[in-house]
Amino acid sequence: MTEFVAPSKIGRSFSGEFPVRLGDADSTGVVRLDGVARFLQDVATDDWDDTGIEASDTWVVRRTAIRVAPGGRWPRYKECLTLTTWCAGYGAAWAERRTDISVGGSLLLEAAALWVPVDRSGHPIRLRALFFEVYGESVAGRKVPGRVPAPVVVEGASRRPWPLRRADLDIVGHVNNAAVWQAVTEVVTGGVDQVVVVHHGPVESGHDVTLASAPGALWLLVDAEVRVSAAFTSTGAATS
């Protein structure tokens, strides 16, 4: 179970403004899950750039959990979102980033993401001393596990092809995290309260991807191996 820790009262935090545009909302005007995923990775990138740390490392996301905050709802088209992000935990070669999403001072969504630094060849590397110089105070010594449970596709799950597009690829040649969330958007119907997406392996150009789904879950498979899994609760979260 994902823990959504409260904002740190000390150390670094970073905020950015992100309006919900046409390309972020569904036909009812509610922000899509992949739109939220883009906002999360954009504010994370902006925060990292703002630190002034000069490094050739790239951060890739391993797990992302998004939930409707108590009393919150899903944002709508043209609303201006304030994303406030901070580092909430760490391990040997990963860090947890918490992000709150608000509109007009009201907290709507909470997110917790596990990020892994990789070198130019895509191999994970240990957190550098510079990381702790910038984020160590807000982390406050909180350690988080980096392992994720082995995925199992349930018996009877429906299956269909999930064609890849060149527009889905990111700078390291993998299908971008936000593009993966489009698969979740395709499967989820109605309001959801919480979604957790886990990346178990890369999905790359040229892969033949199968989308398997069952109530409350989906999997992206390459050669029968699960590369991405997701679990969600659909209980009619508020959208207005």
PLM region descriptions:
Residues 2-65, 117-193, 240:
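Hot-dog-fold acyl-thioester-processing enzymes
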Residues 11, 65-154, 202-208, 214-240:
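HotDog/MaoC-like acyl-thioester-processing domains
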Residues 195-202:
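C-terminal accessory segment of soluble enzyme catalytic cores
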